[in-house]
Structure formats: structure tokens, C-alpha cells
């Protein structure tokens, strides 16, 4: 649910280009495009393009996936203070549940391709993007939580394996103990739950969700980067 496979692919490709002395080719857009080609075309994974672009670009961005297959990346710069404020209003928990992202996404892909009402749900999810970007830019954290909640309600209808009774119970507990909204990250079925929650309510929330572990995190601002390259190999 944290985009680990796509992050690995982007990082591996970045490293290969650096070792070949072709680091100048490792633009954010090119790394993302190559990673998409490897995962979607070469490996045939039934996934989207969001994770690859998020890993390559880093930071907060609005990605627009256009009909011609191109991707437009619009940075969402909150500044140092705004980013810190955003981080302080988000809490991340690991549910302990394991799931196959590919199997859930395969079902989701099949169902969205064969059922017209699924396209309506996807359109509604897309319609939440600009309001969420506006809420982030203007520090409207309660609205951010409400939009995350609305997105999660829509996402659950896309495939049967996205949620389960345990996840539903955890989510309901969170809403009853300070969270204004949230969502399960990734394909669904398990992994990490992200909640919007005022800092003053986070201790209460964590205590209520005592059966799962809270994970501290910070937002990555730079995307993929090579930390060390052997000069003898470029």
C-alpha cells in the first residue's frame, strides 16, 4: 500500500542509468515513464501509473492522466510551514493484514471494464482531486479529512476485496475517536490506514486503535535520487 514495488522499480532504473553514465537521462518524467513500461507492459501487472510518478517526482503533486497516455504533473508547493502543518494532521497505522495488490487490482480492472456504474464512481473520485488540492493549499484540514472519507467510501465499491470487517471496524473506531476521515492506502485488503486527525486528538486516536501500530513518517520532497555512484563506472 506504500507503493514499494513501483518505488523499487524507479530506484533500480535510476541506478542503472547512473551506472551506465547516463544520469542526465534520469529526468523525473523519463524515470516514471520507464517504470510504467516495465510494470504495466513488460511484467503485465494490472496496476495504474500513480505510484511510479509519485516515486519519481516526490513531494506533493496533482497528476493528470490524459487520454493520449501522457501525464501532466503540477507541483503542489505548500512551503516548509504548510508541509509541516500537513504532516502534523496526518497519522499512519499498519493494520497487520496482508493482501495481494495484483489480485485486487485485477478484479477492479475487470469490473470497471464491464460495469458502467464503476466508471461513474471513478469519475466521482477524480472530481475530488481539485477540491482536495485547494484544501491542502489553504490549510483546511477538516475539509481534507472529509474529502479523504468521501474518497474511501467510493473506493470500496470498486472491488469486493478492498475492505473487510476488520478494516471497517478500525475505520469506524477512528472516526469515533477524533479522525475526520481517512483511507486505506494502495489497492486495498490490508496494509496501511491513513487518517486526517487534529494533533490534539491523536493520542486519543492511537489509544483507541491500540491493536495496530502507528508509524511515524515525513513527506519525501525530492523523489528518486542516487546517493552514491562509483566514479569508475560513471
Question: Which positions does each model-derived feature cover?
Answer:
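C-terminal nucleotide
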Residues: 19-20, 33-46, 52-182, 194-234
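Glycine-rich active-site/cofactor-binding loop and its immediate structural neighborhood
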Residues: 190
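Short, charged, amphipathic alpha-helices and their helix-cap/turn boundaries
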Residues: 27-32
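DPxDG-like acidic metal-binding loop motif
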Residues: 2-23
